Amino acid sequence: MKLKLSTVTIKLKLPIAALLLGAGLTACTSQPDSNIVEDNMEFAQQQLRCAFDEIDYAVANESPESRAQREKNGWGPLTNPRNTEPDGTLHLVPSKDWTSGFFPGELWFLYEYTQNNFWKKKAQQHTDILEQEKMNGGTHDMGFKMYCSFGNGYRLTQDERYKEILLQSARTLSTRFKPKAGIIRSWDHNKDKWQCPVIIDNMMNLELLFWATKESKDSTYYNIAVSHARTTMKNHFRADYSCYHVIDYDTITGQVLKKNTHQGLAHESAWARGQAWALYGYTMCYRETKLPEFLEQAKKVEQYLFTHKNMPEDLIPYWDFDAPGIPNEPRDASAATVIASALYELSQYDRKNSERYKKNADRIVENLTNSYRTTLNKDNGFLLLHSTGTKLTNVEVDVPIVYADYYFIEALLRKDKLEKTGKLF
C-alpha cells in the first residue's frame, strides 16, 4: 500500500543532481544563473512524476462524504490537482473548477522542454478529461481551463481536434459578453451582492479570444477582447495604477455600480495577485493587438508594483500590499510567478526598461528557487510553497497551489528562450 506523504516545509537548495548523489554534500545558498532553468526543469519532472502517484492515491481515498457532495452538485469525477490542504493532503478538483487546466498545462510545458513523449501522453490524458468544459457557459474561466490545457496542446501538436475544442470554448466564452457595459461577465454567484461582476482575473481569459480570431478569421472575438480590456482599463484602476478586484456593472446602462474586493484585504487595498493578473493581462493584450494604450497600462502597473513601499526585498509579494501585519503576513508565490512571466514578455516591448524588467524577473525566479521550492519527492508533487488563495476566509493560505507552479514553469521557459534566441514570439 502506498504511504501518504505529508507536507514538508523544509526547503532544500541543492540542485537535483546533488540531491540524487546522497550524503556528504554541502547545501548551496544560490543557483548559478546559467543552470537555474535546467535545475528547475529537472526538479519539475521529478515532482510531477511524484504527483501522478499522489493523484492516484487521492482518487482512491476520496471520502464518501466528498464523493456524495460532488455527485450532488453534478461536478463530475476528480481530475487534476489544485493545492495542498493544511493537513498535507492533496486537493483534487473536477473539470468544472477554474484551476483544472493548469496541471495539464504544466505537462505540456515539460513536453515542450524535453520533447519526451512520456510527457506528451500524460499531457493528453490530463487535457482530454476537460473537453466537456467547452460548453460550460456558466463561467468566464475558459482561458484558464481550456487555453492553458488545450491551447498549449494545440500550439505544440497542431491537433485539429484541439483546435475545434478551443474554438467552441471561445464561442462559449463570448456568450458572456455584455454589449451595453462592454465587458465579459465574470461570476454568476453572489447575485444578492452584484448584478454583473467583472474581476481583474478575467484579463487572463482574453488570450483565448485573440487566438480564436486568428484561427477563425472572425473579428468578433478580437473586438470583444479589446472592448473588455479597454473597459477594464477605464474602470478597474485607481490613479496610482493599482486595481480593484471586482467591478459591478449595470448591464442595462453600462454604469459602474460598485468597486469591491473579494479576495483582497479591503475594497481600497491592492490584492497582490490581482495586480499580477493586470500586469500579465495588459502585456499579453499589447502582444495581440499592438495597441500602445495596453503597453502603457502594463508599464504603469509594473511601476506601481516595483516602487511600492511594501514590495519585499526578495520581490515575492505579501498577499495584499496593504495587509496590516507586514512583514508578518503570508506571501503569495503565485503572484510572484505571474509577475515574473509577464516581465520576461514585457522586456521585449519596452527597450528603455527592458534590462530592468528582465533583471527583476530573474531575481524572482532565483529567490523562488532558493527559498520557496518544495522538497524533492514530497509536498504532493508541487513545485513551490507559500502561495495564498483567499486570506480573509482562510482558504489556501501559505500552501502550494497549482497555478503558482504553472506560471513558474512558464517563466522558466520564457527565460530560457529569451536568453537563447533573444525573442519569445
What do the PLM-derived regions correspond to, one by one?
Residues 26-27:
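C-terminal motif of bacterial Sec signal peptides marking the signal peptidase cleavage site
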Residues 15-23:
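Sec-dependent N-terminal signal peptides
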Residues 31-425:
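Glycan-recognition and catalytic cores of secretory/periplasmic carbohydrate-active enzymes
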Residues 2-16:
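Bacterial N-terminal signal peptides that target proteins for export
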